[in-house]
Amino acid sequence: MAASMNQRVMATRPRGLRPASKNGPILDKGNLSLPQSSASWDIVENNPSIHPQWQPEYFGDAIVVNGKAWPYMIVQRRKYRFRIINASNARFFKFYFSNGLGFIHVGSDSAYNEKPVMVKEFLLAPSEIADLIVDFSNSNSDSAILSNDAPYPYPSGDPVNEANSKVMKFIIKGGHVLDKSKIPTTLIKYPSPNLSDASVTRYIALYEYTSNTGEPVHLYINGKPYEAPVTEIPKVGSTEIWNIINLTEDNHPLHIHLGLFVALDQTELLDVDKFRECMKKINDAIKCQVDKYARGKKIEVPAHEKGWKNVYKMMPKYMTKILVRFSYIHSNASYPFDATAEPGYVYHCHILDHEDNVMMRPLKFTN
């Protein structure tokens, strides 16, 4: 259960991960670690003008953090650790501080970074987690607003307004505070992704289908409904390369059950309308000559997102290459359960409205 905004909790490491370094935990015992969730909800319910099955995304008009709308928190001039999960249906958050304070990014949804990464802002998709430290002793003011400027839907939707551009306020107490905590220069070094380990290369295409009036009615992965027979059957313990081809207008956070992966690069798709037309006809990236279209500009993965993750943002009109491990990343040990047992697993978009509209495919494993 997430701590309330005024509850003090001890610094703990994410479940399943060993301590961050032999030098000790990221923050010394006694420091504050406050798990947070950010979501957006309507203050007043509205009678839907469109059937929920065809509601592409839901955006509320109140930003809620740990059950409170636009809360505030009183902090001392010292380091605090926050674990933030984006629990919104569909809203992306691009977090930044109004007074210019930075974030020291130490981990994500699956693992620690190899080294702490200093960032002034960061983008968090639905279901993504950021593990970070904020040092309020660096503040040049007595308050700081955790702000958001991500359009909705992301990335080409409406700009934020006065209400949803603010997440919460930090009131920074005056006076010097003794802070003996240290942030290690090295956290955890996991095995580096090795393309030569990949036994299979897959192409996964994301589609959006619209009505005659241009309204989105359903979203498919690989042009198939969830009920269609399984087509992805990885071997337990294997490594694969997945090329995610996003043919929609939205950024889709992709989550793979039992898989941990590293985002390698994102390549722009040129002449995407022509490529999409071919893909919707035959749904075969090779036959549609994907290499002919995936030759635009490349987007480098941000330094704080180069580690192992279980969800990642798939940019629209780009092909994102990821290396997926279907095993533990810190060892070659197999799962302590039968991953081949029924009913199997899934991979899906983690925008809740897309997921509930079965932008999802079955995933079965074999030995």
Describe each PLM feature range.
Residues N99-F103, D149-Y154, G174, W242, ...:
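Short edge-strand/loop segments of extracellular domains
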Residues A87-N89, F136-S139, P151-Y152, N246-E249, ...:
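Short, charged beta-turn/beta-strand-edge "cap" motif at the junction between a beta-strand
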